[in-house]
Amino acid sequence: MKVFPATTAAVLICSHLAMAQAPEVWTFDRLDAIGGHPTTVLGSPRLIDTPLGKAVEFNGVDSALVVDVHPLAGAATFTWEAIFRPDGGEQAQRWLHLQETGTENRMLFELRNVDNQWYFDSFVYSGTSSKALIDPKRLHPQGAWYHVAAVYDGREFRNYVNGVQEGAAEIHFDPQRAGRTSVGVRMNLVNYFKGAIRIARFTRRALSPAEFLPLPTR
C-alpha cells in the first residue's frame, strides 16, 4: 500500500475537486459529435459559418441532434448556458432538452415566438418540484445572437438573457441521474427549433453573470 505525503494527498484532492467542478463545453462545430460525445443526427441539420464561428442550424421542421449524455447528471447546483440564434418558425419551440432516463425528470430551454420576437422559457422538473421561468413581456428580436442562462444555487432558480436576469423562484431541485439530451427538438420529437446554436456550457455551480460566457457581439 502506497502512503502519500500530506502535501501530495492535498494536491490530489484539489485536482480531483477541480476536475469535478470543470465545466462541460459543447461547441457546435460538427454534426457527428458534440463535446466529445457521438450524436444521432435526425433530419438535416446543417453546419454553417457565422460571425461567431461554426454553428449548427436547425430547420424547425425535422432536424435535431441526440446525445446519449445528461451533462448535468448528479449536479446539486448548476449553471446552464447557451449562445444561439432564434429565427422564427412555430410559436412554441423546445430547443435544448436534458432528460433523466426512465423518469419524467428533465431540464429544458424553450422559447415562444410572437410577431417576429421571442421570449425565453427555462424549465426544470426534478423529484417533486417543477418550475418554469417565463415572462411574455420580455420580448427580444428574432434573427440575432443571444446568450441565455439558467442558474440554480441550491435555493433559488434564475434565468438570464444577455446577462440580464428575467426570472427567479425559490425552489428545491433534486439532482438528476444519467440520461440523454436532445438538441433542436423536445425529446419526444415535437416542437422543433428553427435557428442556430453555437455553444452550450454546463457548470456544476452557480455562476454570477460576470462569469458567464462572453456575450455575442455580432
Positions of PLM-derived features:
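Extracellular glycan-recognition modules
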Residues: 22-38, 47-49, 61-121, 156-157, ...
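Bacterial N-terminal signal peptides that target proteins for export
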Residues: 1-8
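Beta-strand-rich interaction surfaces with strong enrichment in secreted/lumenal proteins
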Residues: 67-70, 134-139, 170-172
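N-terminal signal peptide c-region/cleavage motif recognized by signal peptidases
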Residues: 14-17
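Localized edge beta-strand/strand-to-loop motifs within extracellular or lumenal beta-rich domains
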Residues: 144-158
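Short, aromatic/His-centered strand-loop micro-motif at the edge of beta-sheets
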Residues: 121-147
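Flexible glycan-contacting loops in extracellular carbohydrate-active proteins
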Residues: 169-196
